[in-house]
Amino acid sequence: SGSCSLKTCWLQLADFRKVGDLLKEKYDSAAAMRISRKGKLELVNNRFNSPTPEDLVYVDPSPDYCLRNETTGSLGTQGRLCNKTSEGMDGCELMCCGRGYDQFKSVQVERCHCKF
């Protein structure tokens, strides 16, 4: 007599926030490389350890996202609203790139069409 067993396997994506946080961490610690005369990648700064296969590396530096750049399509951060109390990416210190920021208070009055 033959017996059957059913086995089901599936892959599931990790939490999106965790993936984003990991990528941001790798981006922030990416290794600067240059191409040697022999056509091989080498570290720009030999004081750092060689990157592992899991590390990010780059040859060209990232553009300055604080400034408007027509070539990359970046609008920059000038004129954007920021959160004064946040230490995250939406916080004024990071988003305004050290340029300082204007503060204002806004009061919005809206009719809510409430019925009692």
UniProtKB/Swiss-Prot annotation:
GO biological process: canonical Wnt signaling pathway; cell fate commitment; muscle cell differentiation; neuron differentiation; positive regulation of convergent extension involved in gastrulation; positive regulation of non-canonical Wnt signaling pathway
Organism lineage string: Eukaryota, Metazoa, Chordata, Craniata, Vertebrata
Gene Ontology CC terms: extracellular space
Recorded family membership: Belongs to the Wnt family.
Protein name, UniProt field: Protein Wnt-5b
Entry comment on modification after translation: Palmitoleoylation is required for efficient binding to frizzled receptors. Depalmitoleoylation leads to Wnt signaling pathway inhibition.
GO molecular function: cytokine activity; frizzled binding
InterPro entries with a match to the protein in the record: Wnt, Wnt_C
Lipid modification (O-palmitoleoyl serine), residues: 1
